[in-house]
Amino acid sequence: MTVQPQAAPAATRAGGTLGKRILAFAGHPLFRGDAQVVHGRNPYRRMLVPGSLAESDFDRPPGPGEWAAHRSLAAHRLLGTYYEAETVLLPEQGLDGLYEDFDLFYGRDLKELREGSVSDLERFAFGCLDEAVDVSGAATPEVLEAYFQHVVEEAAAGPSPALTAIANARDRRSAADLYLVQLALDGLTEASAMSRNLAGAYGPEQSALFKIFIDEFGYGVYDAKHTTIFAKMLRSRAMATHVHAYWNFYLAGPLATNNYYYYLSRDHAKFFRYAGAVTYAEAVFAPAFVEMIKVFRGIFGDAVDLHYCDEHAHIDEHHGRITRDQVLLALAGRHGPRVVPELLRGIAEARLVGGWFEDDTAAQIRWSDDLPRYRELAGSARTGSEPPERVALTAESPFGTRSHDGDVVLEVERGEADLVTTPTGPPERLAHGEALLIPGGRLYGIRPATPETACLLHAVPPA
């Protein structure tokens, strides 16, 4: 490939007031990252890649088909950080040496930036759902029950795209680990969003939801808590178990899925929507974990601890019945047809967002598992007339991951670079002059393999 003229640093396009607040938040020292690929045992620091945020237009929300766009990834990283600042995060080893970070993360300055932008950022990140989901038409408890049964049967009948991609991968172990990382988003802080819907007074449905919550927390026994048994599964794969160790590898779809339940739980005007969403989620979890057990046993045999999956394959059948009968249908019966559209919308949105999780994870697995082919595709890609973006790296450069809205060709202009696309798989070494096509929406990071490394990012115009 011919090296095109070098571009100046990307102009700031973050947009108006929202963009300025986002850049101020992401530019805080807590969120600038370090040179390590895996984050340390500090829940307050996570890489928000402030340099790439400046390229995103936060005046242009992603449409229904743009959930994997870079600005969607950036928005959901921010939202996830905002939401977690409303929970209690303490490192397992204690706060010694981290008191200052604790104070900064929960302190007034970042809190004011969050509170001044969270509603606008939610509209930016989730506004596309209004366009993508239509719940017009008859809205009765009977319609609600029939629609719910239909989508649950649909989910149970079809194989998981992500688990299918794992089973078909050349490097199935790395693919399986990538999937575990996406589950860790919720698995290590499980039921945190649900906890925001437990206060108040709303009758037997409140008690039914609390039954599920206390199950997730092991009825007060820490060793039985679902986050504890999820960590056992990670340890059996020799993976880190602290919160957000693999922050750099969370994909836009899984981030959006996790954030969606916080989004609904933060605004109690959306309570009935939450009730629909959580009922759908609980109903489809059990068959999904049955499929996961089959795939993971086929790869790892008895070397992987699947207690977490066994537990969910069993308990979520029970939770599915509770939420369907004692939450979803009970709320519709008690409060009448007027709440049914919101219950329906919650089911439909949860189904859609869950599809983002599956499709994004499957696409990342397929791409990262077939990088030699994307070396070949780089050679035939037609890049645009715009000068490429130049990225210079040294051993001290902070490591972060990002994606692009459209396809780009990554070319090594100086030195050598390691392309990192999975949390545990080997990186793809690119020598001077070599190139690789990165499809739009695919997550990657670059590590220098020589004292000084420079890469060029050539945009590929849509066909």
Residue positions per predicted region:
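Non-heme di-metal
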Residues: 2-394, 399-413, 418-462
